[in-house]
Amino acid sequence: MQETRLVSCFGHNLSLSKQDFSEYYIFAVMKKIYHLGNCTTCQAIIKNTGIDKKGFVMQDIKFEKITPTQLDELKVMAGSYESLFSRRAMKYKELGLKDKKLEEKDYRKYILEEYTFLKRPVVIIKNKIFIGSEKKTVEALTEAVI
């Protein structure tokens, strides 16, 4: 019996063979954006870079939560969970996190518990990662998308 894996692609669950899963995984990692659909900053970046027309896998983190495996893969690319963590999230102040000394395990836990703690957008293109909406990041992303 052939081993299969269940994956989510554009809101649909797919059962893929091990080989197909490997190919899907490579594709998904090569061009993917983790974003928040109702975030106007994310919307502007998606529109201005043309990501929505360039074959990117688009994961709205509000409706398709980031998985522990996905977050761990992003951490490998980014270098730390802290670099993926948003201090702009309303819950950051509500939970009094600015007064606490957070460690890597804490950043990971909070991102997995609350989608707004993921700095966004996070874009993967081949082996490069672009995190957040700072001007220099968006400029580099725009160059990479072209």
Report the location of each language-model feature.
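Conserved beta-strand segments of alpha/beta enzyme cores
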Residues: 55-57
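Short, Lys/Arg-enriched N-terminal segments with co-localized hydrophobic residues
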Residues: 15-29
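Local sequence-structure signature of Cys/Sec-based thiol-disulfide redox active-site neighborhoods
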Residues: 29-48, 59
